[in-house]
């Protein structure tokens, strides 16, 4: 048994020396010192030894076990140090290499257009007014000359929450609220914000989009003031060479009402495939505030008048930057967003 123990020590120490990973060293430990290992078998067989042999073999077994364990511990520390050094070498940073610059964030194209239009109108003396996106039927329709039985309500398929509350279909409710709060005083505001309609999403329609509506109420306001304001707006946003024209239209909250066209960007008014041969592209709607709307808001329509207009933000962005699908604004595709 003495020779067996000495042979075990030689074999174990040699395997420890050859092991190069913590896993292989753990395998050596289990092989020689585990519950089913040869050292355990030797110790179990000591009961068969004579009284004279037992202390000698027991002392030798403990010496061999201690030698194997201490050699294992020392080798594990060596391997740990080697593995750490290799890891550090692999993760070493070359400080002479140029650093990676992070991509700076920027405003979304729609926000850029909104900021540009807001700055433009603020420069013309307008203030910015805002209101809730969840509106009452009163402000979204009735205060804008759209009573419950008005056929024009069918033109705006709405998201109703209850019978009397809905997601606003335009930012005009902000105008109604502002007029009521003004107590008959002059107003010059723009109202930017999200609006919602039950449209099928396609290249030119979205169930959610953004508007900027404008409202001016004062004495002696005329259609000429509306036309002059929109001419300034178009020339500053799209360039001095752009012209506008007004066409008769119908909106319940304005009378008279107009559609506003801009001279074609591609052909300059001569006629092409973009403008469908007309030389003009429709961009927004507006008109003189209906006397009923003024009266419901507390104004004397015999003394004051006003004009209003509504601008689709996505429409402006598509025209100015040549975007052909409104859905690009909301898909969060960086390939599109990073172009602007």
Swiss-Prot record:
Swiss-Prot/TrEMBL catalytic activity: tRNA(Phe) + L-phenylalanine + ATP = L-phenylalanyl-tRNA(Phe) + AMP + diphosphate + H(+)
Ligase is among the record's keywords: yes
Pfam families recorded: Phe_tRNA-synt_N, tRNA-synt_2d
Main location: cytoplasm
GO molecular function: ATP binding; catalytic activity, acting on a protein; magnesium ion binding; phenylalanine-tRNA ligase activity; transferase activity; tRNA binding
EC number: 6.1.1.20
Record-level GO BP terms: phenylalanyl-tRNA aminoacylation
Keywords linked to the UniProt accession: Aminoacyl-tRNA synthetase, ATP-binding, Cytoplasm, Ligase, Magnesium, Metal-binding, Nucleotide-binding, Protein biosynthesis
Family: Belongs to the class-II aminoacyl-tRNA synthetase family. Phe-tRNA synthetase alpha subunit type 1 subfamily.
NCBIfam families assigned to the protein according to its UniProt record, in alphabetical order: pheS
Protein name: Phenylalanine--tRNA ligase alpha subunit
The organism of origin for this protein: Exiguobacterium sp. (strain ATCC BAA-1283 / AT1b)
